[in-house]
A protein has these predicted regions:
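Short structured motifs
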Residues: 18-22, 81-87, 109-111
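HotDog/MaoC-like acyl-thioester-processing domains
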Residues: 91-92, 102-150
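Hot-dog-fold acyl-thioester-processing enzymes
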Residues: 37-62, 74-75
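Hydrophobic residues positioned within well-ordered beta-strands of beta-sheet architectures
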Residues: 34, 81-83, 97, 122-124, ...
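Short secondary-structure junctions
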Residues: 13-19, 72-77
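Catalytic strand-loop segment that frames the active site of acyl-thioester-processing enzymes
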Residues: 16-48
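Extreme N-terminal tail/first-helix region
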Residues: 1-15
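Hydrophobic beta-strand-centered segment that forms part of the acyl-chain substrate-binding groove
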Residues: 64-104
Length: 150
């Protein structure tokens, strides 16, 4: 799945991404990079609203799992189970979120567990950059669930 395909998917299936004007910058096995402008995500302090920052970080993390699972040829529902967001600096500009697997060496185990149990859990991180600085970090636990058979 390339950047255009992912962006089309997000806009069709996660309408909030379109409202926030999120664009897909890069899709790689090591991470997904998303970008969002300040204007539709602004708060009363003329910086990025914390909820927008969190949403873009979660979207980047979810997108990484989505693209990796699809590349494996597996159909799975992906949901976030829990997350922690650390806000380091206010963002007064357009911003990006770059996701990564917290422990890349756990991917084979994740896929084996999913194949055997029909569900598996994995931690994904995302780092937000704004104004040329790391502004926030997300750590999230995501769960892959087998799709029900008709």
């Amino acid at each position: 799945m390339d950047a255009r395909e992912l962006q089309d998917y997000l806009q069709a299936h996660i309408p909030l991404s379109a409202a926030m004007q999120v664009t897909v910058v890069a899709v790689e096995a090591s991470g997904v990079t998303l970008a969002a402008p300040l204007a539709p995500n602004i708060n009363h302090r003329d910086t990025v609203f914390g909820g927008s920052a969190s949403a873009v970080a979660i979207l980047a993390a979810w997108s990484l799992l989505h693209t990796r699972v699809r590349a494996e040829g597996v159909a799975a529902r992906l949901v976030i189970q829990s997350n922690a967001m650390e806000y380091l600096l206010p963002i007064a500009s357009d911003f990006t979120a770059r996701s990564a697997l917290a422990e890349p060496d756990q991917w084979p185990r994740f896929m084996r567990t999913f194949a055997r149990m029909g569900r598996a859990r994995l931690r994904v991180t995302a780092e937000l950059q704004g104004d040329g600085h790391v502004a926030a970090r997300l750590s999230g636990e995501f769960v892959a669930l087998a799709m029900p058979t008709p």
